[in-house]
Regions:
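FAD-dinucleotide binding site
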Residues: 1-98
C-alpha cells in the first residue's frame, strides 16, 4: 500500500492548481480523478457540425489576475473574450438555459 501526506480529489482547475503548486515545492501528493479526462467543468464540446460549445468556466476576464498569472507561467495563451452578440447562458443544470 502506498501512503501520501496529501491527497487531491478531483482534477478540475483547483485540483490541478494545487497539484502544480505542490510539484513546484517538491512535495509528494496523489491526485485522483473519477473521469477519463482532466479539467473538471472546463470542456469544449462540439455540435454535430463541429462548432465549438464551451461547457463551464467559459469567461476569463481581466480581473482574474491569479488565473491569468498561472496561465502565463505555464505558457498557455489566452484570447480576447467576446462580450457582445448573443449567447446562451445556463446558470445551473437544474434550470433552463437563458
Amino acid at each position: 500500500m502506498t501512503t501520501t501526506e496529501t491527497l487531491i480529489i478531483g482534477a478540475g482547475l483547483t485540483g490541478l492548481t494545487i497539484a502544480y503548486e505542490l510539484h513546484k515545492a517538491g512535495k509528494p501528493f496523489l491526485l485522483l480523478e473519477a473521469r477519463d479526462r482532466t479539467g473538471g467543468r472546463i470542456l469544449t464540446s462540439r455540435t454535430d457540425d463541429g462548432a465549438p460549445v464551451e461547457i463551464g468556466a467559459t469567461w476569463l476576464g481581466k480581473k482574474h489576475e491569479d488565473l491569468i498569472g498561472l496561465l502565463s507561467e505555464l505558457g498557455i495563451r489566452t484570447f480576447e473574450q467576446v462580450t457582445g452578440g448573443r449567447a446562451i447562458y445556463e446558470a445551473s443544470s437544474l434550470s433552463p438555459a437563458q
